[in-house]
Amino acid sequence: MNFELTEEQTLIRDAARQFARAEIQPVAAQCDRDAHFPLELMAKARDVGLVNVTVPEAYGGSGLGVFELALVTQELAWACAGINGTLSLNSVVADVFHVAGSAQQKASVFKRLAEGQFGAYALTEPAAGSDVSAIKTRAVRRGDTYVLNGGKMWISNATLAEF
């Protein structure tokens, strides 16, 4: 069994490493001090294929897998875990729709992510933390719609998200 990175994976890792050192590391400490996310970094990272890593190419994403996302995340987080969290979250949002979205939902969400919109991720609950087996929020079908009942906290990308 070969555990070496493929040539494509090496290029992806190296691009993420170079971006992290050139673009993220120089601003990371100031962003932490100011509790500020540099939106211009999102556009730059998207332009070089480091955002929306798991969004299919047909919708404007990189069309890569979770292993390649892990390579990108590792390099970006080296420079700043906070900035990486925001940059990589769109792939987490995309993965939810890969697994459970209808074709119509996938088309809508993937397109919006690829256009530069931010998605949010609501997992943590007051009584459950991030233990998915203890989550109480439920979606109940009522006719043609779903009614959500429950409470969430610490929503990832909540201040930036457009959906």
What label would you give each PLM region?
Residues 15:
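Alpha-helical bundle segments that constitute or directly flank the non-heme di-iron/ferroxidase center
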Residues 1-8, 139:
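Intrinsic disorder at enzyme termini
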Residues 25-163:
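Glycine-rich flavin
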